[in-house]
Amino acid sequence: MQMLDLMKERHSVRQYLDKKIDGDVKTKLDTYVASINEESGLSMQIFYNEPNCFNSMLAHYGKFSNVKNYIAIVGKKEEQEKAGYYGEKLVLKCQELGLNTCWVALTHGKVNVQTKPQQKLLILIALGYGTNIGVAHKSKPIKELCKEDAYPEWFMKGMEAVSLAPTAMNQQKFLFEMKNGQVYAKALRGFYSKIDLGIVKYHFEAVTGHEVR
């Protein structure tokens, strides 16, 4: 499946079936996480069949149900953008494997992650087999997500991918532009905007093959 089609299919899911992640899917997921950790220097830690993290008032407030599997992304405070970038890379791999996901910032309970000095839990990703496939989020017009100009077709294809990216509270607090053939993106003020910046950068690069600075 083409990457853009995968992005179109993937939506946030908060309610899950009581179905284990095992067999070939679990093996492929574990292998992929290990490769991302090696590439990124982050510490992504998968928890399977662990219901306690989402058995809290905060999780119920966030409308999560039956979440028993999740990925904790651990890194340094200044690695939030990297967490978003590689986390979204993993999210789309989960989608390819037939799993549903949801980025989770605050609406969860205690997580027993392993951390090294200067590391902290940056964000979680809930995953599993959803009771539904989720719904598409509303997006700002592409012209509001990048500085107006006469951009080439590949840039606009990248912006289509960017418009499909999940962001905290669907705020889309970022701005893209191109100068002298180089694509730039910056985070605007907002909750978890640095993580969001990493997510949208991955969407653009994965579809176009062009680096975003």
Predicted feature descriptions by range:
Residues 1-213:
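Acidic, surface-exposed loops and disordered segments
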